[in-house]
Amino acid sequence: MSADIRFDSLKTIVPAVSRETADRLIAFEDLFRKWSKAINLASPSTLADLWNRHILDSVQLFPLAKEATRWLDIGSGGGFPGIVTACFLAERSGGCIDLVESAGKKAAFLRTAAGHLHVPARVHSARIESMWEKIETPQVVTARALASLGDLFTLAEPWLSDGAKALFQKGRDYQREIDESRVGWSFDLVKHPSAIDQASVILEISNLRRKTD
């Protein structure tokens, strides 16, 4: 896929995307492919369609909170959506994203990617729970393919209950996860359809509170 085709595909999601951001995302794809030969950053079956399946899918989040400058991505894995978001924040004065990833090799890749792309990302090789008191409450918390919605609430509760908004990407079972999570939690919800996968959504969560008997 040529750079121009990838740039045009980006503009279908973020019409005002700059060429500089597009170049960073293309460079990230190239770096991801190189590292994937040595460590498992994503399912091998998805690498053939890496641009659409992972990068464009992650791009969708930034326009939903484009005014935010302080982001946090938990369980960052191979950098989706964390490094992708960082590519957009690179052109935002004061923008920064914290990436939390417990797997050492993946955290090493994230650090390499952040440095290679010159993006404002801080990588924490640690368990999410250990960062509750170390990372200041961001404006937005993101997660992709990490855990069930209820478990995500538990992992991100210190930040979400302090005013942060969540953007969680979910697959075809999202409604079941929503229903199950409402047993123990109250929250405001906006469902954004995915532009990449018709069976998926982005759940925008705010005002999270744990229910008490």
Curated annotation (Swiss-Prot):
Enzyme Commission number(s): 2.1.1.170
Subcellular location(s) per record: Cytoplasm
A Pfam family reported for this protein in Swiss-Prot or TrEMBL: GidB
Record keyword Oxidoreductase present: no
GO molecular function: rRNA (guanine-N7-)-methyltransferase activity
Catalytic activity: guanosine(527) in 16S rRNA + S-adenosyl-L-methionine = N(7)-methylguanosine(527) in 16S rRNA + S-adenosyl-L-homocysteine
Record's keyword annotation contains Transferase: yes
A single Gene Ontology CC term: cytosol
Major enzyme class: transferase
Record's keyword terms, sorted: Cytoplasm, Methyltransferase, rRNA processing, S-adenosyl-L-methionine, Transferase
Gene (UniProt): rsmG
Residues that bind S-adenosyl-L-methionine: G75, F80, I128, E129, R144
Family named by the database record: Belongs to the methyltransferase superfamily. RNA methyltransferase RsmG family.
Alphabetized InterPro entries for the sequence: rRNA_ssu_MeTfrase_G, SAM-dependent_MTases_sf
Function: Specifically methylates the N7 position of guanine in position 527 of 16S rRNA.
Protein's name according to its UniProt entry: Ribosomal RNA small subunit methyltransferase G
